[in-house]
């Protein structure tokens, strides 16, 4: 049987760096323009009012205000920022 054995340690050892994805500012939190609200892969959250969508699908605030997460459809969430009173 010509099987290679015992070379596991030299062939293992690959792992990607963490990407720090996820929600950075939650509903009800105050944000300023340019603050990142969500970092994501693809549009898990869709942009709503007063937010921008970056090239890597990062959602960020365009105005001073409060973050809200709204149910857009059955399986879609929308992130908006509304001006604080």
UniProtKB/Swiss-Prot annotation:
Q: Does the keyword Ribonucleoprotein apply?
A: yes
Q: Which GO terms describe its cellular component?
A: cytosolic large ribosomal subunit
Gene Ontology terms: biological process: translation
Give one Pfam family: Ribosomal_L27
Please give the InterPro entries that the UniProt record associates with this protein: Ribosomal_bL27, Ribosomal_bL27_CS
Top-rank taxon: Bacteria
Q: Where is this region: Disordered?
A: 1-25
List keywords of the entry alphabetically: Ribonucleoprotein, Ribosomal protein
Which segments does the entry list as coiled coil? none
Would I find Ribosomal protein among this entry's keywords? yes
User: From the UniProt record, which GO molecular function terms apply?
Assistant: structural constituent of ribosome
* UniProt similarity note: Belongs to the bacterial ribosomal protein bL27 family.
NCBIfam families on file: L27
What HAMAP family does the record point to?
Ribosomal_bL27
What name goes with this protein?
Large ribosomal subunit protein bL27
> What is the organism lineage in this UniProt record?
Bacteria, Bacillati, Chloroflexota, Chloroflexia, Chloroflexales
